[in-house]
UniProtKB/Swiss-Prot annotation:
Its EC number is 3.5.1.-, 3.5.1.62, 3.5.1.48. The active site is at 159 (proton donor/acceptor). The gene is aphA. Zn(2+) binds at residues 195, 197, 284. It comes from Mycoplana ramosa (Mycoplana bullata). Substrate binds at residues 19, 106, 117, 323. Optimum pH is 9 with acetylputrescine, N(1)-acetylspermidine, and N(8)-acetylspermidine as substrates, and is 8 with acetylcadaverine as substrate. Its cofactor is Zn(2+). Changing residue 158 to A: Reduces enzyme activity by 97%. This is Acetylpolyamine amidohydrolase. It catalyses: N-acetylputrescine + H2O = putrescine + acetate; N-acetylcadaverine + H2O = cadaverine + acetate; N(1)-acetylspermine + H2O = spermine + acetate; N(1)-acetylspermidine + H2O = spermidine + acetate.
Length: 341
């Protein structure tokens, strides 16, 4: 299984995160990718290549052009405005406010942000582009006939919606990969999100589309980030009616329960007729993850990989979350072992 990985992820190295009323070192940091890369190499997945550079043709089909222009220019505009720290949103277009987009950078950050823990820092745009490129190259491998590939993306992407960033995400890598597969000739693609946190950005992008089935297994949004999407009754709209499946689960969920949701989601994906599955892989379902509340163990990730691989369709694994403990590398490697058989 080929691994696509860009060293440019290091350009995204924010120093602050708003968490629990404090500015703390971010949970989403460069060492995450280094731990994962070392572990997958040690597990034998050592065919690691850097992605090619890609333009915006594919990403413009899933993200708003104005939003992408904002991301590209935000840091320079923030500094030009005289602000000293990293760019953190402080005001938001909440209920019953104007739909107009502000012209100044402070207002625009609030307009395009869905979660204030995520600062924009130097190199954010460049790192996001490199992460997107890893997803595109992974999709190209699947389109070329590979049975599986791993896009070791950082920063992650599944909280990035059509025109919003947050949850450490800026460009939705899984969505871009799915779009790339469609552009290469596929008619139906599934995105299976196994991160602890609901893929609200991915749902936002595909909720009214009928060519991508989105399934998400996640912590109940009544008590877990991102809070405002991810309920079971959200099943799609218009052309996308019936193409979203949410599986919210409560505190302490073990694999015995989580695995039942996985099995059901794969049945739904098979009924949809997906020609490939993009797996949004977060290992923050791990029992020791510092910002989650599921109870999966390291061996469970091998079972997870085997179960997904049993679907029989090509798999592109795209890295999402998993924080704070060295076992994130082992757990990712275990998923790949399960996929590889």
């Amino acid at each position: 299984m080929r691994v696509i990985f860009s060293e440019d992820h290091k350009l995204r190295n924010a120093k602050t995160e708003l968490y629990g009323g404090e500015l703390v070192p971010p949970f989403e940091a460069p060492f995450r990718a280094e731990w994962i890369l070392a572990a997958v190499k040690e597990a034998g997945f050592d065919d690691v290549v850097a992605p090619a550079r890609h333009g915006l043709e594919t990403v413009l089909k899933v993200h708003d052009a104005g939003y992408l222009n904002f991301l590209e220019t935000a840091w320079d505009r923030w500094k030009a405005a005289g602000y000293k720290g990293e760019a953190i949103a402080t005001s938001f277009p909440v209920r019953r406010t104007s739909p107009r987009i502000p012209t100044d950078i402070e207002g625009q950050i609030g307009y395009y942000c869905n979660a204030a823990e995520t600062a924009i820092s130097p190199g954010t745009w460049e790192a996001a582009l490199s992460s997107m490129a890893s997803a595109i190259d992974g999709a190209d491998l699947i389109a070329a006939g590979h049975k599986a590939a791993f896009s070791l993306c950082r920063p992650p992407g599944h909280h990035a919606g059509i025109d919003m960033f947050g949850g450490y995400c800026f460009i939705n890598n899984a969505a871009v990969a799915a779009q790339r597969l469609l552009d290469k000739g596929a008619k139906k693609i599934a995105i299976l999100d196994v991160d602890f946190h609901h893929g609200n950005g991915t749902q936002d992008i595909f909720y009214e589309r009928g060519d991508v089935f989105f399934a998400s297994l996640h912590g109940d949004p009544a008590e877990a980030f991102p809070h405002f999407l991810g309920y079971a009754e959200e099943t799609g709209k218009g052309a996308g009616a019936g193409t979203t499946a949410n599986y919210p689960m409560g505190r302490g969920t073990p694999y015995s329960v989580w695995g039942e949701a996985l099995t059901d989601s794969l049945k739904r994906i098979a009924a949809f007729g997906a020609e490939a599955i993009v797996v949004s892989l977060g290992v923050d379902t791990f029992e020791q993850d510092p910002i989650s509340f599921f109870k999966l163990t390291s061996p469970d990730y091998i079972t997870m990989g085997r179960t997904i691989a049993a679907s029989g369709v090509p798999l592109l694994v795209v890295m999402e979350g998993g924080y704070g403990v060295p076992e994130i590398g082992l757990n990712v490697a275990n998923v790949l072992k399960g996929v590889a058989g």
